[in-house]
């Protein structure tokens, strides 16, 4: 799989871009702040419908514009597929697949399968659980695009149930059975969609675990072994059953958990049980990585998670596109060599670097230079002719 064309209109610092790409390695070189990362961000958005840098779409629209368009042509086993995504301020996003409008942007998921390595990856180890949940959900969706609908359904039910909890704290004490019966309905729906999402995550973690262990050993030979596990809000007592990933069990366990925590939920007005409170646990030896891993160990573990994702996607079908955003500058020589070795076998690798010296020695790659130019419409990124 490779991206043959990337087109941008008013995306971040790019007023206009039309890039013809090819298999193999391409390096975008430019000073920090010149917009090279925005190119990889656009490709990652086309792959996952989300940015690795911000949680909302509004910052992706260039200042002064009311919408942005990201267009890609992806080649997979000789077949071309065109995806156009329109991100609009204050309006629903739109998508076209092979120039035909689709009902939901989620229908383009799976066309471009990519793995992104970026400086922000340290948050996978050191950041909040939401970072690790997003890692799992993005990867699960790349492998099974239908998971996107499950995520959307769960998030919708979670918002509505939380709003109901906030409004019910007084009604509970007044004995408003009608309102509490409504909460029972939302409990059932939360458990249904939550069980589907948890089952997908747990299955993914079980497949990722050996790949993470192998990747970490490659990056840090002789170090403590790396391991991962899924920690649910259902508590340690149910860990073995939860990690089996049986959907019926998970649904029943979520319903029981919601019933057990109802008083606390009504008191606090928040939902305390469900996959939105789960985490991907990372271990080095017998020690939890977060808060205890060194900087080098944290980097190795973060890279291991990305390398494991790459291996799973590669095993599913064709090689995913590798996106490497300024990561070589962050790595020591050993980790550079390990990552470069993986990139050697990929069908397409797109890399950003501030200077040529950040690229591994001996790499044969097409070089494109990114510049920033002042115009009447502000400062815009351009490729040097």
From Swiss-Prot:
UniProt-listed Gene3D superfamilies: P-loop containing nucleotide triphosphate hydrolases, RecF/RecN/SMC, N-terminal domain
Main subcellular location: cytoplasm
GO molecular function: ATP binding; single-stranded DNA binding
Coiled-coil residue spans: none
GO terms classed as biological process: DNA replication; DNA synthesis involved in DNA repair; double-strand break repair; SOS response
Gene transcribed to yield this protein: recF
Keyword hit for DNA-binding: yes
Localization terms from the record: Cytoplasm
The name this protein goes by in its record: DNA replication and repair protein RecF
Cellular-component GO terms for this entry: cytoplasm
Residues noted as binding ATP in the record, renumbered to the chain: 30-37
Keywords: ATP-binding, Cytoplasm, DNA damage, DNA repair, DNA replication, DNA-binding, Nucleotide-binding, SOS response
Primary role: The RecF protein is involved in DNA metabolism; it is required for DNA replication and normal SOS inducibility. RecF binds preferentially to single-stranded, linear DNA. It also seems to bind ATP.
InterPro entries: DNA-binding_RecF, DNA-binding_RecF_CS, P-loop_NTPase, RecF/RecN/SMC_N, RecF_2
The keyword Cytoplasm appears for this protein: yes
Family: Belongs to the RecF family.
């Amino acid at each position: 799989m490779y991206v043959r064309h990337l087109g941008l209109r008013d995306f971040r610092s790019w007023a206009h871009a039309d890039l013809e790409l090819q298999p193999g390695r391409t390096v975008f070189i430019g000073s920090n702040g010149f917009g090279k990362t925005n190119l990889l961000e656009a490709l990652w958005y086309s792959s996952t419908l989300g940015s690795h840098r911000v949680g909302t779409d509004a910052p992706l629209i260039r200042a002064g514009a009311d919408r942005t368009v990201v267009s890609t042509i992806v080649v997979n086993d000789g077949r071309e597929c065109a995806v156009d995504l329109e991100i609009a301020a204050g309006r629903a996003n739109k998508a076209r697949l092979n120039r035909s409008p689709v009902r939901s942007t989620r229908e383009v998921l799976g066309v471009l399968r990519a793995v992104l390595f970026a400086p922000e990856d340290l948050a996978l180890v050191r950041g909040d659980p939401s970072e690790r949940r997003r890692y799992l959900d993005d990867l699960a969706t790349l492998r099974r695009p239908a998971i996107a609908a499950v995520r959307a359904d769960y998030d919708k039910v979670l918002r509505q149930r939380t709003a109901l909890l906030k409004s019910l704290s007084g009604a509970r004490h007044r004995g408003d059975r009608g309102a509490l019966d409504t909460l029972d309905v939302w409990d059932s729906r939360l458990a249904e969609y939550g069980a589907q999402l948890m089952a997908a995550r747990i299955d993914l973690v079980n497949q990722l675990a050996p790949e993470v262990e192998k990747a970490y050993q490659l990056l840090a030979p002789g170090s403590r072994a790396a391991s991962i596990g899924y920690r649910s809000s259902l508590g340690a007592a149910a860990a073995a059953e939860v990690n089996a990933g049986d959907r019926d069990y998970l649904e029943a366990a979520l319903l029981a958990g919601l019933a057990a925590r109802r008083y606390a939920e009504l008191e606090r007005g928040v939902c305390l049980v469900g996959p939105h409170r789960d985490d991907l646990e990372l271990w080095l030896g017998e020690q939890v990585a977060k808060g205890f891993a060194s900087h080098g160990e944290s980097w190795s573990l973060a890279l291991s998670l990305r390398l494991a994702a790459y291996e799973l996607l590669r095993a599913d079908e064709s090689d995913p596109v590798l996106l490497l955003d300024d990561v070589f500058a962050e790595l020591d020589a050993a980790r550079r060599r390990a990552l470069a070795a993986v990139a050697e076998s990929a069908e397409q690798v797109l890399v950003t670097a501030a200077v040529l010296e950040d690229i591994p020695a001996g790499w044969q790659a097409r070089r494109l230079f990114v510049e920033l130019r002042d115009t009447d419409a502000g400062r815009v990124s351009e490729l040097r002719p």
